[in-house]
Regions:
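Rhodanese-like catalytic fold shared by cysteine-dependent sulfurtransferases
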Residues: 1-33, 40-88, 99-146
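Short, surface-exposed ligand- or partner-binding patches at beta-edge/loop junctions that are enriched
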Residues: 91-92
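Conserved G/P- and acidic residue-centered "switch" motifs that form tight phosphate/ATP-binding loops
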Residues: 96
Length: 146
């Protein structure tokens, strides 16, 4: 179940937001950052969210690697990307699964409030056997290829 961001919440795993809610958080709060926790192959070949119109950049930190294996330095790399304690973070993956783990781990490390973006960048697989049902791209939010 999705929960609406609440500014009175203490830092921590704050739950889920849909792509539109994440976009609105990024628009309205200059402190909110996006961490895309997909793999480099996904960023390169599928595309990425484009926050340039907001004067922001996406932090790209892989949760796991293309050939398998978790990124043991994930939290350290999130911090190296400039994410600070107390700063709202929206985590994005392909379909909203890896980003849950990323948000929870960030919370355990003292970062956040941390949100998982439901549906992710590409969303669920539809009847067409393509990821064309929901997600950041399908909802028409800014993105770019390559």
């Amino acid at each position: 179940m999705s929960q609406t961001p609440d500014e009175s919440q203490q830092p921590g795993y704050a739950g889920d937001v849909d792509p539109q809610q994440a976009w609105e958080m990024l628009q309205s709060d200059p402190e909110t950052v996006m961490v895309d926790c997909r793999t480099e192959a996904e960023w390169t070949f599928v595309g990425t969210a484009d926050l340039g119109g907001l004067g922001k950049e996406v932090a790209f930190v892989p949760w796991n690697y293309f050939q398998g294996g978790l990124n043991e330095a994930f939290v350290e790399q999130v911090r190296e990307a400039g994410v600070r304690e107390g700063q709202p973070i929206v985590f994005l993956c392909r379909s909203g699964t890896r980003s849950v783990g990323a948000a929870k781990l960030a919370t355990e490390a003292g970062l956040g409030p941390a949100y998982n973006i439901l549906e992710g960048f590409e969303g669920a697989v539809g009847e067409s056997r393509h990821r064309d049902v929901d997600g950041w791209k399908v909802r028409g939010l800014p993105w770019r290829q390559g």
